[in-house]
Curated annotation (Swiss-Prot):
Pfam families: SfsA (PF03749), SfsA_N (PF17746). This is Sugar fermentation stimulation protein homolog. Belongs to the SfsA family. CDD domains: SfsA-like_bacterial. PANTHER family: SUGAR FERMENTATION STIMULATION PROTEIN A. It comes from Histophilus somni (strain 129Pt). HAMAP family: SfsA (MF_00095). GO terms for molecular function: DNA binding. NCBIfam families: sfsA.
Amino acid sequence: MQLPNLQSATLLRRYKRFLADVELNNGEILTLHCANTGAMTGCGEKGDTVWFSTSDSKTRKYPHSWELTQLKNGQTVCINTHRSNQLTLEALQNKIITELAEYDEILPEVKYGVENSRIDFLLKGKNLPDCYVEVKSVTFVKNHLGLFPDAVTTRGQKHLRELIAMKKRGHRAVVFFAGLHDGFNRFTVAKSIDPDYAELLQQAVKEGVEVYSYAVKFDFSHQKPTALYLTNLVNYLE
């Protein structure tokens, strides 16, 4: 997917979960909105280069959005977790996700389940069972191992319960972990961070819920990031 026009700055601090202060090359200090409300472990330290977009909306209190971080180790991570669904939709449309390529109809944000949930994507195809796809962002990486979650996620636990129920009703159910960090080539659940989520995911797999994780690639043109896209399946370590 193509990124909006981005500007670079130096990260000073992140605070109140939603905000980050950065310094431009001319010394000006800006406050960015941060869409990622998680722990963001390893996603940006003071002095890292960040890339931000600017909205034309006159009603936004903070028109600048933190999009990417270039880490000191040379790796890049997308901070804007809204991009994970956009990336996944593009990959589904272009048949990049081979495990789901037989489906022709993609319905986003469909209400389902018994816990007042919305599925990220409901896939439909001729003579195929409906396929419920829940997308999660992978931004936490240690030693080339992608991990989810980076904080306790009761919402994620709810989604797993809903997917298990859909599978029991005869549908396909998928948890899709979309890479937003280009530094991992394997994926697993962060049991030490959210053991309840890890236990539920293990139960979901036993019930037939499918788990896939795809890596991400960032394109840089004229010394700035211009696009990112999902590339290939990475090994899921149960």
